[in-house]
Regions:
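A glycine-rich dinucleotide-binding beta-alpha-beta segment and adjacent secondary-structure elements
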Residues: 297-323
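Conserved glycine-rich beta-strand-loop-beta hairpin in the small C-terminal domain of fold type I
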Residues: 266-272
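N-terminal Rossmann-like NAD(P) cofactor-binding subdomain of oxidoreductases
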Residues: 19-217, 253-255, 279, 288, ...
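Short, conserved charged micro-motifs
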Residues: 279-287, 348-349
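A common structural junction motif
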Residues: 285, 290-300
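Oxyanion-binding "anion nests"
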Residues: 220-266
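Short hydrophobic/aromatic beta-strand micro-patches
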Residues: 274-276
């Protein structure tokens, strides 16, 4: 129902991140495999590679047996979907995974053993000390440390950290509080369909029983649909953001508090972010840093009450940042609050992965 929306919203390119010279055994026109090609992120892998001019010698579309024999479109040609097996990677240079943690844990090592470099969108390897966890705007230099697998961070972490990083570089952030407003796209195509269908049923006065989400989705919001740690009270999504922030920033001392909420929005996550720096920080300083930060676009019009919104972030590569203001609860002048929005399927997933793949060897891009 909403699958066409995935590609239709992929329109605007972000500022280019200039690749550094990196020695990798990847050909100029690599064979690229996509695992999970029929999913929401898989569709965006294809669209993102196409519009960014990513050179591909051959595309291998991999999915489960039930999708085998179907086709996907790539650069005007139909590519037949193959069933994912242990022999799928024999001739592959780069593999983009977005089929869930269990699939990644089983097949990513097989792909690496066959000679492929893996960029994995699941949480399977993110906290493995030997696996780089990369946001290219922040730590592209870590790509060269890979041993075959590079992890794509959590979408909520990416959304917050891209604009926080330039501030952290100039004035160390010692504490950050994040409250998320996460769209259906983060739970996949089936969740997006359920939001549309349940909204229609609700408007027509019909009963709708949730099949994907744990609670009614239309005109409702609820705590992120991941398991709750009975001791801390934090859900898995919140814990991921905390741990990944520290790993990506390479700062175990940074204090992170997170509350993750699922909202009835089709696509694009929003987050309220308040951070405290070691030294005093002003709104003007933050604006100046963000104005030249790669992957960031300031949307902050107080006169018109116009700030980042999901409808504007959908299809955008940049993280939108607005509501930049002093945190009045901190009289020391060390804290700033802001509101951010980003397309979860793009910068939160597919775009970030493709940016990583672009940086493997400089010669991958024309």
């Amino acid at each position: 129902m909403v699958r066409g929306f995935f590609v239709a919203c992929s329109m605007v390119r972000s500022r280019e991140i200039m690749p550094k010279e990196m020695e990798q055994n990847v050909s100029n026109d690599p064979v690229v495999a996509i695992v999970g090609v029929t999913g929401a992120v898989g569709a965006e892998f294809i669209a993102t590679m196409d519009r960014r001019g990513f050179r591909v010698g051959k595309l291998k579309a991999l999915a489960s047996a039930r999708s085998s024999g179907k086709t996907v479109s790539f650069r005007g040609e139909r590519v037949v979907i193959e069933e994912l097996t242990e022999h799928s990677f024999d001739d592959v240079d780069i593999t983009l995974f977005s089929a869930g943690g269990s699939i990644s844990r089983k097949f990513a090592p097989i792909a690496v053993k066959a000679g492929a470099v893996v960029v994995d969108n699941s949480s399977a390897f993110r906290m493995d000390p030997s696996v780089p966890l990369v946001i290219p705007e922040i730590n592209a230099n870590r790509i060269r440390d890979h041993k075959g697998i590079i992890a794509n961070p959590n979408c909520a972490a990416i959304t917050a950290l891209v604009p926080l990083w330039p501030i952290h570089q100039k004035n160390r952030i010692k504490r950050v509080i994040i409250s998320t407003y996460q769209a259906a796209s983060g739970a996949g195509a089936a969740a997006m369909d359920e939001l549309v269908e349940s909204t229609r049923a609700n408007l027509n006065g019909q009963l709708y029983t949730p099949k994907v989400m744990p609670h009614p989705y239309a005109f409702n919001l609820f705590s992120h649909n991941t398991a709750i740690d009975p001791e801390t009270g934090y859900n898995d999504e919140e814990t991921k953001v905390i741990k990944e922030t520290r790993k990506i920033f390479e700062d175990d001392r940074i204090a992170v508090g997170v509350t993750c909420v699922r909202v009835p929005v089709l696509r694009a996550h929003c987050e309220a972010v308040t951070f405290e720096c070691e030294k005093p920080v002003s709104e003007d300083q933050v604006r100046s840093l963000l104005a030249v930060a790669p992957g960031v676009k300031i949307v902050d019009d107080r006169a018109k009450n116009y700030f980042p919104m999901p409808v504007d972030a959908s299809g955008q590569d940049d993280v939108l940042v607005g509501r930049i203001r002093k945190d009045l609860s901190d009289p020391s002048g060390h804290s700033i609050s802001m509101f951010v929005a980003a397309d979860q399927l793009l910068k939160g997933a597919a775009l970030n992965a493709v940016q990583i793949a672009e940086l493997l060897p400089e010669r991958v891009m024309a």
